[in-house]
Amino acid sequence: MKLQVSILFLCISILNARAQISIQKISNNWQFRNVNERIWYSATVPGTVHTDLLQNKLIPDPFYRDNETKLQWISSTEWEYQTYFNVSKNTLQNKTINLVFEGLDTYAEVFLNGKNILYANNMFRTWKIDVKNLIRSKGNHLYIKFFSADRIADSLANIATIKYPSENNRNFIRKAQYHFGWDFAPKLTTCGIWRNIKLEIGDNYHTTKNIQPSWDVELKQTPDSIGQSFYFTEKGKPIFIKGANWVPADVFLPRISKEKYRNLLVAAKQAGINLLRVWGGGIYEADDFYNLCDSLHIMVWQDFMFAGAMYPADKASLENIKQEAIDNIKRLNHHPCIVLWCGNNEIDEAWNNWGWQKQFNLSNQDAVRLWKEYQQIFQERKFQTLSRLTQSLNH
């Protein structure tokens, strides 16, 4: 297979300075509850429902003995979050007031002052909503209802007209795949406001185009008698890669502090690691991770978030995946540490060598369709998106 990658060069306009933009985080006075109960409990944002339940002493430690099994009810339950916030009168005078959700995990319905403003369906996307006509100075009520990812994944699988190879139905939803259990992780399919919510006030941007990378790193793929080469050079000299695989540093992502990122990455640097591969079953990492890799001169091989399964390529799924890619390429592509974008984790390998066709009893017709959908996602859509948002693309 030709590995789908993109060397980091910036072609898009990066929001390098926001002279007239002001930010108001919506992080205080949050509450949450089970939709089947009446009592509200205090919540931490960013956070997850599991960590909020732990903080309120409503569940035992999920990592102790067999508590993982005992706590599976959490992922089949719907959860509500709410807060009230104020804004200044000066804020209300601005022509543009956007409410930005940097990470909602995963299926969520959002209401502001009783108005339905968003239905989120992708953990990896950023959602920006114009709320100029809804916001008021006092007592703004923000309410979010999270739906069961397990139940939605199962319902989507049940109506699919073909079997998509996977050990469960995680491949039907855009959520961190390790949340459904992996060889290193328990099955704790959480939900919640896992990244910041904020108001962006104002709309005057200063942009800088065609920023050049500060690291002169290139991928070399030269045909030879047995295939083609695959190595990196820096300033024209081959690099001996001492790499490692990076998976999320905590099952509950908001618990990963900047200090924890720093400790782990400094340890990797001291061990001689010069490249980390951000694994496709996890997340597009936090800004702190990439900032630290930039400063430590640790290269990053960046997977897109697909791993060990075949994924649906219907129209709605393709559009969702496209927007996910755009959001994350725009957010990350200015980091010199990212030397490679990779389409997925092990799917081509699995299709050709893991016996999926026999294991999942696929007909020849189904196999042809699945491979065509694979190509749509990873060789057509990803190629088009990366080509438009980067200066150079190898695939």
Write out the residue ranges for each language-model feature:
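Bacterial Sec-dependent N-terminal signal peptides
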Residues: 1-22
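Accessory beta-strand-rich segments of carbohydrate-active enzymes
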Residues: 26, 33-35, 76-204, 275, ...
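N-terminal carbohydrate-binding accessory modules
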Residues: 28, 206, 210-268
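Aromatic- and glycine-enriched glycan-recognition loops and surfaces
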Residues: 73-79, 91-95, 127, 131, ...
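The substrate-binding groove and active-site-proximal loops of carbohydrate-active enzymes
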Residues: 118, 123, 183-186, 245-257, ...
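Loop/turn elements at helix/coil->beta-strand transitions in domains of secreted/extracellular proteins
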Residues: 139, 237-239, 269-276, 294-301, ...
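Aromatic-lined substrate-binding rim segments of carbohydrate-active enzymes
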Residues: 266, 275-321, 327, 383-387
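Active-site neighborhood of glycoside hydrolase catalytic domains
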Residues: 295, 311-395
